[in-house]
Swiss-Prot record:
Posttranslational mods: Phosphorylated by AMPK at Ser-190; phosphorylation increases HAT1 activity.
Pfam families, per database record: HAT1_C (PF21183), Hat1_N (PF10394)
Lineage: Eukaryota, Metazoa, Chordata, Craniata, Vertebrata
Renumbered residue ranges of the record's region Interaction with histone H4 N-terminus: 62-64, 225-227
EC numbers: 2.3.1.48
Organism: Homo sapiens (Human)
UniProt entry tagged with the keyword Cytoplasm: yes
Residues bearing the modification N6-acetyllysine: 9, 15
Gene for this chain: HAT1
Active-site residue numbers: 276
Protein known as: Histone acetyltransferase type B catalytic subunit
GO biological process per UniProt: chromosome organization; internal protein amino acid acetylation; nucleosome assembly; subtelomeric heterochromatin formation
Gene3D superfamilies per the UniProt record, alphabetical: 1.10.10.390, 3.40.630.30, Histone acetyl transferase 1 (HAT1), N-terminal domain
Top-level EC class: transferase
Subunit text: Catalytic subunit of the type B histone acetyltransferase (HAT) complex, composed of RBBP7 and HAT1. Interacts with histones H4 and H2A. The interaction is dependent of the ability of RBBP7 to bind to the N-terminus of histones. Component of the histone H3.1 and H3.3 complexes.
Substrates-to-products reaction catalysed: L-lysyl-[protein] + acetyl-CoA = N(6)-acetyl-L-lysyl-[protein] + CoA + H(+)
Length: 419
């Protein structure tokens, strides 16, 4: 028995040692993948230019790790405009294939699943492509030009927004490179069917000078799908929107979304613009853009706002900027908050009740449906009692929802004040 115990202890210790050794060969792919947008040769050695993915689970699993390497680096460097790519895997050491019958993950194979062929693997070839970048020009039709002041002041950076499609020469290949960023920055990203002509593409570029020549750098993009609405309308739906990390926080998302709305206003057949599974950050962005667009419309004057939400607001928002009724209501609520004196008890009460009436509508419907079902299953007294409990819970949830909404609306108003 003593011998058996010693053997068991040895096995436990051996297993622990093996697990510890294997753990040394696990790498977090969110930090192992290094992304870079290259404009100048010196950018290759400049760590300030490096940025990292937010998500890698679609290629490397829920734990977002790669096994089998120490000091793993997955280099994905892109020339800033054309997005010509250099892909290389580097590491300090790799697990021995004979080590306890384990083998390293095929990191290169996983990355090849999403990046198109034709990439470089060495620096010299990449620098040769960089020298030809002066020939790269944006695709499609120029829609909008705007400037952003340098954070240090004294210099304006110029940006342009273009609309493109797959008939533009070279755009299909460019888009294949561009869409790879989705996997790193959108949690549920997937690639679209580019052969479907209903897709529209909106691209943001920075226009800059290099050695006396004008060049362009990719900033971000949006894809929009045009759904058919019976009998003769379309409803553009925003599917994907991404501003690359080095350009975030500079207002490009707002410029892009506003430009898209203004573009579609020119088409009488467009009913309104929606979004596919919008994130919280997208909803905040949309709130800001739509309020900015609508704030000077006559139907959203202070006098009209204080009288409550009405059909004129719905019609004018739809006709002027392709905004649907639900979004027009949010615009009204934000602008109503802007003109409401919250220190005035009567104005505050009127605003609070107006918002809560809208918030409680689905609760009331749910309660009516629930009451009908329970009458078939339980005595009336018990049903009434349970309904009272639900009403109490609804009031708490309603107040919480109201306060959260007001907080979100105030952030939009603060941003408007900074414009």
């Amino acid at each position: 028995m003593a011998g058996f115990g010693a053997m068991e202890k040895f096995l436990v210790e051996y297993k622990s040692a093996v697990e510890k050794k294997l753990a040394e060969y696990k790498c977090n792919t969110n930090t192992a993948i290094e992304l870079k947008l290259v404009r100048f040769p010196e950018d290759l050695e400049n760590d300030i230019r490096t940025f990292f993915p937010e998500y890698t689970h679609q290629l490397f699993g829920d734990d977002e790790t790669a096994f089998g390497y120490k000091g793993l680096k997955i280099l994905l460097y892109y020339i800033a405009g054309s997005l010509s790519t250099m892909f290389r895997v580097e590491y300090a050491s790799k697990v021995d294939e004979n080590f306890d019958c384990v083998e390293a993950d095929d990191v290169e194979g996983k990355i090849r699943q999403i990046i198109p062929p034709g990439f470089c693997t060495n620096t010299n070839d990449f620098l040769s492509l960089l020298e030809k970048e002066v020939d790269f020009k944006p695709f499609g039709t120029l829609l909008h030009t705007y400037s952003v002041l340098s954070p240090t002041g004294g210099e304006n950076f110029t940006f342009q927004i273009y609309k493109a499609d797959m008939t533009c020469r070279g755009f299909r290949e460019y888009h294949e490179r561009l869409q790879t960023f989705l996997m790193w920055f959108i949690e549920t990203a997937s690639f679209i069917d580019v052969d479907d002509e209903r897709w529209h593409y909106f691209l943001v570029f920075e226009k800059y000078n290099k050695d006396g020549a004008t060049l362009f750098a990719t900033v971000g993009y949006m894809t929009v799908y045009n759904y058919y609405v019976y009998p003769d309308k379309t409803r553009p739906r925003v599917s994907q929107m991404l501003i690359l990390t080095p350009f975030q926080g500079q207002g490009h998302g707002a410029q892009l979304l506003e430009t898209v709305h203004r573009y579609y206003t020119e088409f009488p057949t467009v009913l309104d613009i929606t979004a596919e599974d919008p994130s919280k950050s997208y909803v905040k962005l949309r709130d800001f853009v739509l309020v900015k667009l609508c704030q000077d419309l006559p139907c959203f004057s202070r006098e009209k706002l204080m009288q409550g939400f009405n059909e004129d607001m719905v019609i004018e928002a739809q006709q002027k900027f392709k905004i649907n009724k639900q979004h027009a209501r949010r615009v009204y609520e934000i602008l109503r908050l802007l003109v409401t004196d919250m220190s005035d008890a009567e104005q505050y009460r009127s605003y609070r009740l107006d918002i809560k009436r809208r918030l409680i509508s689905p609760y009331k419907k749910k309660q009516r449906d629930l009451a009908k079902m329970r009458k078939c299953l339980r005595p009336e007294e018990l049903t009434n009692q349970m309904n009272q409990i639900e009403i109490s819970m609804q009031h708490e949830q309603l107040e919480e929802s109201f306060q959260e909404l007001v907080e979100d609306y105030r952030r939009v108003i603060e941003r408007l004040a900074q414009e």
